[in-house]
Amino acid sequence: EFHQLMTQLVEREDSQYSYRNTLVAMTENNEIAGVCVSYDGAKLHELRQAFIDGAKQTFGRDYSNMEDETTAGELYIDSLCVSNSHRGRGIATQLLRATIEKGQRMNLPTGLLVDTGNPQAERLYKSIGFTFVGENTWGGHPMRHLQIHNS
């Protein structure tokens, strides 16, 4: 059911997980190697509503009081994923750099949350130029808010 809900959200234009907010890294064989989902933080509540409605309908759970992971004033990286078979090839770095360029075109810094229990991911983000801007909690997990500003 979760997979079906997420597929529906990707297919919509008014969802935080919309194909319109997604960069896809493809291999030479047209396999999906990785994805990066990002959107204007000012639109979080508007874009999240599709998930809230879908979760109520699919699971009977109300997520309307979920913590905000972003705010206005940044291009927020919601999700970054590289398939296991394609890791270690610089795909995450390429997706991040393309997303940072998107933020530059929008005249916004690019931000993300990284779980404090994932120092390897934080090292990757910092190696690209992200810097620590504050602590946050999301989904009950302590998170670190990182941003990279336009040069």
Where are these regions (language model features)?
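Active-site rim helix/loop that mediates acceptor-substrate recognition in acyltransferases
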Residues: 1-22, 27-28
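Short glycine/proline-centered loop/turn elements that form peptide/ligand docking sites
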Residues: 92, 96, 118-121, 138-144
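Conserved catalytic-core motifs of GNAT/GCN5-like acyltransferases
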Residues: 41-43, 111-113, 126, 131-145
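Conserved acyl-donor/pantetheine-binding loop and adjacent beta-alpha core of acyl/acetyltransferases
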Residues: 39-75, 79
